[in-house]
UniProtKB/Swiss-Prot annotation:
Class of this enzyme: hydrolase
Subcellular location: Cytoplasm
InterPro entries, per database record: ArgE/DapE_CS, Bact_exopeptidase_dim_dom, Peptidase_M20, Peptidase_M20_dimer, Peptidase_M20B
Assigned GO CC terms: cytosol
HAMAP family xref list: Aminopeptidase_M20 (MF_00550)
Binding site for Zn(2+) 2: 142, 177, 381
Stated family: Belongs to the peptidase M20B family.
Name this polypeptide is given: Peptidase T
Residues where Zn(2+) 1 binds: 79, 142, 199
Function: Cleaves the N-terminal amino acid of tripeptides.
Length: 411
């Protein structure tokens, strides 16, 4: 199983599948199509049924039940794309056998060093087989590790018919990293009662609560005049954007918040004297606080226009997803089964809120309650990303155990 997971993740990681905010196609990048087609072939090869990829790049497949018991259809999902935060081109995964707890030189030339001094969690992986980057790209274990684990779990169930299970659906979705993953997901065609995203981090993560999320684009308009004759004429939109940013509560940013605390996050600032465009994401677990954050921004824009003239600044706000807890709590048996499945494989469940979102955040509001389980990875979205292959094995075993538990609960 370990070898299969390494082989699969290495193959998937080498395909550049970064999504693209600016694109209006689905998927937003050609690389996601490349991976989708590869997965279709692999699903057929391992013996899955009803293997499809639709016009939007959503891959689906079925593992038929091997028992006549009345077991609800469950699903497992992972996403094709990788984050936009750091390059995913020419990924070159590195394997570290029996990690010794010391510094890992990812790239001697640059240099890039993955050190337990900077990332103390590394000490949890002494003796493990690790997969790392070469220091020049992200790894893409988010979420290609989840794809590898689901694929390996399905192959295990197919080759071990003595493990009884109900009908299982799997899906691999595009554009999750830019919040569009479920936008064209056909819940009716997927035809599952419950599902799990395999899109978490370290060993044991079990999550059924996510942020409420919105995105804001704020455009500042200025007036460009030759600087030599600009007195009382020039309006520098960049300075207005900086002043606006300084009006936001400085301690309510990602680098200063944790647990259930929300934030405003400045993700992009592009401008000139004439025009500056600023992108924010807004996050909070509490729905009323989430709405208050959005109101704060719109009120600040109104204040700006009153002070500097109508049309000086404009805002576009759109909600991305909501806290999935509201939709999962009425079906807590799916969390309980995942909890028991982890314990049955020697994994201590860690139930905590997702300081982010998954496809499950939106799918749960589309009628498919979908909590999230771990993959085994750490430091996602950057050059220090790594994953324990040993914990990938555990994640695969947990997927198998969830299928078993649903079958057992139907007896």
């Amino acid at each position: 199983m370990k070898h299969d997971l390494i082989r699969r993740l290495t193959t998937y990681a080498k395909i550049d599948t970064q999504s693209d905010y600016a694109s209006t196609t689905v998927p937003t990048t050609d690389g996601q199509w490349t991976l989708a087609r590869l997965l279709v072939d692999e699903l057929k090869e391992i013996g899955m049924s009803d293997v499809t990829v639709d016009a939007n790049g959503y891959v689906m497949a079925t593992l038929p039940a091997n028992t006549d018991a009345d077991i609800p259809t469950i699903g497992f999902l992972a996403h094709l794309d990788t984050a936009t935060d750091f390059t995913g081109t020419n990924v070159n995964p590195q394997i570290v056998e029996a990690y010794d707890g010391e510094d890992l030189v990812l790239n001697a030339t640059l240099p890039v060093i993955l050190s337990p001094k900077d990332f103390p969690a590394l000490k949890n992986y002494v003796g493990h087989t690790l997969m790392t980057t070469d220091g020049t790209t992200l790894l893409g274990a988010d979420n290609k590790a989840g794809i590898a684990e689901i694929m390996t779990a399905m192959h295990h169930l197919i080759t071990h018919p003595e493990i009884k299970h109900g009908r299982i659906r799997v899906a691999f979705t595009p554009d999750e990293e830019i919040g569009r993953g479920p936008h064209h997901f056909d819940v009716a065609a997927f035809d599952a009662k419950f599902a799990y995203t395999v899109d978490g981090g370290p060993l044991g993560e079990l999550e059924y609560e996510s942020f409420n999320a919105a995105a804001a684009e704020i455009i500042f308009h200025g007036t460009n005049v030759h600087p030599g004759t600009a007195k009382d004429k020039m309006v520098n939109s960049q300075k207005h954007a900086m002043a606006f940013q300084n009006r936001l509560p400085g301690d309510e940013a990602p680098e200063f918040t944790d647990g259930f605390e929300g934030f405003y996050h400045l993700i992009s600032f592009e401008g000139s004297v004439e025009k500056t465009t600023v992108q924010y994401i807004i996050r909070d677990f509490d729905r009323s606080k989430f709405e208050a954050r959005k109101h704060f921004l719109t009120a600040l824009v109104e204040e700006w226009n009153k002070k500097y003239g109508a049309g000086s600044v404009e805002i576009k706000l759109n909600d991305q997803y909501y806290n999935m807890r509201e939709k999962i709590e009425p079906h807590m048996e799916i969390v309980d089964i995942a909890h028991a499945a982890m314990e049955s494989r020697g994994v201590t469940p860690i139930i905590k809120p997702i300081r982010g979102g998954t496809d499950g955040s939106q799918l749960s509001y589309m009628g498919l309650p979908t909590p999230n389980i771990f993959t085994g990875g750490e430091n996602y979205h950057g050059k220090f990303e790594f994953i324990s292959v040993d914990n990938m094995v555990k994640a695969t075993e947990v997927v198998v155990a969830i299928a078993e538990r649903f079958a057992q609960s139907a007896k």
